Amino acid sequence: MSSTLNMEQQPIQSHPAKTGAQPVQPVPASGRTRTLLLIYPPLTVPTSPPLGGAMLKGYIERELPQWQVKVLDLNLWCYGRVFAMLRDGSLRIPEQFMGNTSTEELLRVPDFVMGKGPADFYEDAAAYDRYGRLLATLTGVIGEHLGRAADDWKPGAPLDPLLAEALQLIGGEQADCYGVSMIFIQQLPVGALLGRVLRQQTGKKVFFGGSCFTAGTDNFLRWYPESADVIVDGDGEEPLKKLLEQDGSPEGVSGAVFWHNGQVVCNPPEYRRDIDAYGGAPDFSNLNLADYYSPQPVAPLLLSRGCYWRRCTFCVHHMSAGLTHRLHSLERVIEILRQMTGQGVRHFSFVDEMIAPGHFANLADAIIAAGLGISYYALAKPTKGFKPEILRKMAQSGCKYVLWGVESGSQRILDLMDKGTRVEDMEQVLRDAHAEGIANHVYVMAGFPTETRAEFIDTLRFLTRNREVLYSIHRGVFALEPGSPIFKNPERFGVMRTWEVTPTALGGRWMHECASGMTRQEATELLTSVQPYLRAFHPYAVMMAYFRDHALLLYAQRGIAAMRALPRHFPAWRYLTRGGVSRPAAVPPG
C-alpha cells in the first residue's frame, strides 16, 4: 500500500476549527519546569477526543506540580493534513480504493460530518451514508498505508512524508520525555515508529501504555525492541507518576515491561481499589473539542475500571484492568459530569466494559437528581435485572441507546460463551428498553467454536423476531484471542487444534479447528451472505452502525420517537448452504 499512495511533503497546515463548544482553558504552566508530551497516534475514526491522555494529564499535573503535560492528538492532526494534501494535490488516492469519487466530493466529508455542509447531517440519510462511507474508506486506506510505511522503514531511509511531518510537529514541542497512548491495534506500527525515532534522535525517555496492551505486552517489546523504554501494563496513573519521579527508571514500578540485561522483564501490575483517588474530570484543555468530526462534541468517560462479569470465554478486554472491577463513587461521577457540562459538553460515551443493572439504576438516579440535562450511550449485557423501572430511569437520565452484548440467539452457544444470559430474558429486555425510549444496538457473533449453521440461523431468527425494537446490528466472526479462556483450554470448547496463522506484535493471529460446527470460512461466508438484511436495521442510515458517537447525536437531536417513525425496508434474508447455494430463510417476515 505504501507504494500506491502518492504523497509530496508540504508545510504543516492545521484543519480550520469550527465554531461551537470552546476548548477547556488550560491550567497555567507557571512553575512547571518539565514537560511530558502524551501522543495519540493515527489512525482511527476522529469523532471524539482520546480519553487516556486527558486522564493522565489531569492526574500528573495535580500530583507533580513541576510537570506540565501536553496531549497531542496526532490522529486528528493526521486527518487535517490528509484533507489539506488532497486539496493542494500533493496526495492522490488511486481509483481502486475510492471508485469514481471525485476529490471535490471527498473534500466535502469534514464539513458534512461536522455539521457545516449544505447537506443536513440530521435529515439527509443518503448524504450521511455517502460521506460516512467515504470517511470509513479513507480511514482504512490511509491507516493501512501508514502502518505499512512505519513497519517498512529502515534507519537512513526517507520517512513517509506524513510521518516525517508528524515527527517534526512532535519535535517542536521540546518535551523532556514522551508518552504514547494506544487503544487500537492499527495504531501500534505508527506508535512503535514514533517511539523508536524519538528515542534515537532525542535521547529522551519514551513510555507506552493504553488498553490495547491487554495481553502480549512482552511480545510487543520483542517485536518492536527499540520502540519504548517502558511499557505500562494496567492502570497508567501511578506507574507514570513513579516513572517521572525516577527519571524513567522502571525499578519498583507496577506493571512496567522493559528490557534488562537482554531480557524482557515484566513487573506485576497493581490495581488501586479507590479509583476516585485518580482525580476528577479528564483534562481536555489541549484539545479543541469542536475540531472533531462530529456536529457537537461527544466526550468519552470511564466511570469504572474492569468488568464485573469477567467470565465471557472469548474475551480479553477486561485484562487491562486485571481481574478487578472498581467503580468511581456516584459523587465523583456527578462531579466529573458537572465539570464537563460546565465546559459546554452535554453528550457522552460511557466507555466502561459494561454497566450492571443495579449500578445503572443508581447512576441514573444520581444523574436525574443532579439535573444535568445530558445525553449518553453505554455498554451492557441484557440480563433480566434490567427491569422496566430501571430502563425508565436510564431513559430519563439521558441514555439514548445501549450497545447490548447479545452475541447469539442459541442458548447452547450462550452457555458455552458463559454469558450468563437467557434468550427469553434478552428478548424481554430489548422490548422493554424500546418501550421506555432507549434505542437498542446489539452485538452478534458468527462462528463460535462448534456453532452450527442452524445455530447461527437461530441468531438470525432472534433478530427477525425482535427487529421492530432493534436499531443496529454490530456483527463479526469469532476470532481466537491469545489469553482468552478458549485459548487456554481449547478442548473444553470442542477445539481440536489451534495454530498461529500470522505472527503479530501482540501474540499473533490464530486459527482453530473444531470437531463439529462451521469452519471460520463457512461462518464468514454465512455472515457475508446476510449482510444486506443486517444493514437494513438502522432506521436512518447504514453507516450509523459504524460511527457510534454520531448515532448518539442523531437520537438526541431527532428523538427516539422520530426514529421509530422512519420506514425500514428489510430484504428477504438469504443464506448460503454448505454447498454454496443461496436459500431463502424459513422465517416469517415479521
Model region roles, listed by residue range:
Residues 34-35, 43-79, 138-269:
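Glycine-rich beta-alpha loop elements in corrinoid/cobalamin-binding modules
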Residues 183, 211, 306, 353-355, ...:
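Active-site beta-loop-alpha junctions enriched in small/polar residues
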Residues 5-19, 23-32, 259-300:
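N-terminal [4Fe-4S]-dependent radical SAM core
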Residues 73-82, 215-219, 359-360, 412-417, ...:
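Flexible glycine/acidic-rich beta-alpha junction loops that bind and position SAM and/or redox cofactors
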Residues 1-47, 53-55, 61-62, 66-68, ...:
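Radical SAM enzyme core and accessory elements
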Residues 276-439, 461:
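Radical SAM [4Fe-4S] cluster-binding motif and immediate context
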Residues 220-242, 393-402, 458-480:
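Structural recognition of alpha->loop->beta junctions
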Residues 77-87, 91-175, 225, 317-375, ...:
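Conserved Radical SAM active-site core
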